[in-house]
Structures are given as C-alpha cells and as structure tokens.
C-alpha cells in the first residue's frame, strides 16, 4: 500500500513537537474510563491536557480526531497504519484518547506485529487490558496509568503515574521535548512519572 493511500484511510497522524516520532490521536471525549474520571476531583483526567489547549482551541483538531475514530472501522485500517508506521523507529499510540474496546486493542497488536522494527508505546487507563498482556507483541510497551494524581501501580509490568513533584520524565527540563530520552518505550523501566499538567 502506498503511503498516500494509507494516510487517506487512517485520516493522518499527529507529529507532536515533544515526541521523537508520529502518534495517533483520538478524541479524549470518547475515553471509556477517562470520561468517568473527568468528574472525579483529584483524578488525572479531571485536568486532562487533551481537553484544553490546541486540542480545543482549533475545532479542526477535534473533527480530525473523530474522523480517526471512524477510520478504525475501515477494512484496511490495520494495513494502512502499518504502511506508515513501519517508517518510524518510535511510535506513540494515543497522544489523546484511549483504547475503545478489545477489537481496537487486537488491531493495535496486529499493527505492531506488522512493524517489528518500530518501538511502540501505548499509555492507557483501561485496566481490563491487563488480561491481554500475555499476547502483546514484544515491540509494544503498554503503560497503565492509575486514575489518581500521586497513585502508583506496581501490579503491571509497566505503568506510569502523575506526580506533584519529583517526576522522572525529563521533558519539562528539556524545553518540553523527549530529546534522547526513551523511558516510555523502555520495557525495563517499570514506572515513568510525569509532572501534573
């Protein structure tokens, strides 16, 4: 599949200035767990970064995210995603939004298997995914993000957390960029912590 055709099917990718590669953005309004947590004081989702700033300032961004959500139903979505992602060394799933259901997760697993030379990182708040970790491809790191600020999770092989201070993510001290840091993609790092937005 040609890249031009693949981008048309997938509705395009996000290139955030912070990240070392492309990412795929879905509407945070459609997060299954996050939409409930938004109403919970002290939860990470109560101040979701994907529901403010450029994500809401420009209506075209929200419209594009909904087109991407719909694009996942295309019969060639998996192949189209792989056609673009295989050109990337690093890929982040969902700079906004989250896994919608088991079918969505299995499609991501297929894409990872079709792009074995790409390092994939998938942050999620969907706890049910833990039951599917045994079948995940080796080139995919899934980091579970506990719901509350300051909450730690040690039961997953990889997780992340939001903290008020002492974050391990170096991006804030590096002009908001990952630069040469790849903690999030590194399965040997059990927990990555981020400063509260």
Label the predicted regions.
Residues 1-197:
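Class I S-adenosyl-L-methionine
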